């Protein structure tokens, strides 16, 4: 069985997440061994939150779940590519389709290139 080399990377492996239908890059996150095993077993993208220090099933709060369509591993076994079906239209916790919604202009300023899919204040209120 192919497994990411968690030992080489200090226990966390980066994951680039891409829309399987369009090729759009949605986000970058990290997984540990438990998140890897949970993702394989459930078919839903499960990551490890470095700030909360716990597993995080993408979309469990917002409903914007990522269904795994394909997983690829790089030649060094230390980076993954999740190709997903993005349910609900937004991968970013700030309400955008992609976490890469800001274009950096030549002068160093930022320009938002996407419309918000949802209002985070409404979705994540406690």
Curated annotation (Swiss-Prot):
Pathway: Amino-acid biosynthesis; L-histidine biosynthesis; L-histidine from 5-phospho-alpha-D-ribose 1-diphosphate: step 3/9. It is found in: Cytoplasm. Its cofactor is Mg(2+); Zn(2+). Disulfide bonds: none annotated. Zn(2+) binds at residues 75, 92, 99. InterPro entries: PRA-CH (IPR026660), PRib_AMP_CycHydrolase_dom (IPR002496), PRib_AMP_CycHydrolase_sf (IPR038019). One of its GO terms (cellular component) is cytoplasm. Homodimer. Belongs to the PRA-CH family. It catalyses: 1-(5-phospho-beta-D-ribosyl)-5'-AMP + H2O = 1-(5-phospho-beta-D-ribosyl)-5-[(5-phospho-beta-D-ribosylamino)methylideneamino]imidazole-4-carboxamide. Its main location: cytoplasm. One of its GO terms (biological process) is L-histidine biosynthetic process. It comes from the Bacteria. Catalyzes the hydrolysis of the adenine ring of phosphoribosyl-AMP. Binds 1 Mg(2+) ion per subunit. Binds 1 zinc ion per subunit. Keywords: Amino-acid biosynthesis, Cytoplasm, Histidine biosynthesis, Hydrolase, Magnesium, Metal-binding, Zinc. One of its GO terms (molecular function) is zinc ion binding. It holds the Pfam family PRA-CH. Its EC number is 3.5.4.19. It comes from Desulfosudis oleivorans (strain DSM 6200 / JCM 39069 / Hxd3). Mg(2+) binds at residues 74, 76, 78. This is Phosphoribosyl-AMP cyclohydrolase. The lineage of its organism: Bacteria, Pseudomonadati, Thermodesulfobacteriota, Desulfobacteria, Desulfobacterales.
